[in-house]
Amino acid sequence: MALRVQFENNDDIGVFTKLTNTYCLVAIGGSETFYSAFEAELGDTIPVVHANVGGCRIIGRLTVGNRNGLLVPNSTTDEELQHLRNSLPDAVKIYRVEERLSALGNVIACNDYVALVHPDLDKETEEIIADVLKVEVFRQTIADNSLVGSYAVLSNQGGMVHPKTSIQDQDELSSLLQVPLVAGTVNRGSEVLAAGMVVNDWLSFVGMNTTATEISVIESVFKLNQAQPATVTTKLRAALIEDMS
């Protein structure tokens, strides 16, 4: 299922939100309606946490995470870091990264297994991504754009990339990521996919301007119509237990 929401009359909901299979971050200061939309859908399954990073609300663009971890920029204060550590599941590793390209959400796209990163990302940051998020890392561009985190959205079920991504590039990326990919838009034609939507393995939230056609493409490629949180979390728990044993 893909649900339409707005953050204070802004359709770029992916700028103010970070959604994974084990937690959801929502910027402090949004309307209560925005927060409650996430709480209503996710509250029984994963924690929905109010958070800011470096005093900024654009947490979706500044952070990157998956079920294993969360990377935050160097501008994150000690208090903000402590709040995240107190609020997220113990199994989620939180790490503050010293990286020149500090809008981590713009330069990294990931699911629970692989990450696409900006070609100029520090080597040390690449190693941190692999270690904390437990993913295989690939330096990549999307439709000749280095901001892979802005122009690609991934889950473990599928992915969506910039509408100008060639078929050949889609095929290469798909085999690299091992998930089906589609080129598409959100918010009535916006190419900046990650600004307009967030997705995990059973649910997506999109900007209010997103058309019915865009929603049906999103639900199809991310396999949201057949996904149930209960089955997903059961699988995740089994995987986590397996990891720990």
Swiss-Prot record:
UniProt-listed SMART domains: eIF6 (SM00654)
Main location: cytoplasm
Key words, A-Z: Cytoplasm, Initiation factor, Nucleus, Protein biosynthesis, Ribosome biogenesis
SUPFAM superfamilies: Pentein
Alphabetical list of InterPro entries matching this protein: eIF6 (IPR002769)
Localisation: Cytoplasm; Nucleus, Nucleolus
GO biological process, one term: maturation of LSU-rRNA
UniProt GO MF annotations: ribosomal large subunit binding; translation initiation factor activity
GO cellular component labels: cytosol; nucleolus; nucleus
Keyword Nucleus: yes
UniProt family annotation: Belongs to the eIF-6 family.
Record function comment: Binds to the 60S ribosomal subunit and prevents its association with the 40S ribosomal subunit to form the 80S initiation complex in the cytoplasm. May also be involved in ribosome biogenesis.
Assembly mode: Monomer. Associates with the 60S ribosomal subunit.
Protein name: Eukaryotic translation initiation factor 6
Organism: Drosophila melanogaster
Taxonomic placement: Eukaryota, Metazoa, Ecdysozoa, Arthropoda, Hexapoda
Gene: eIF6
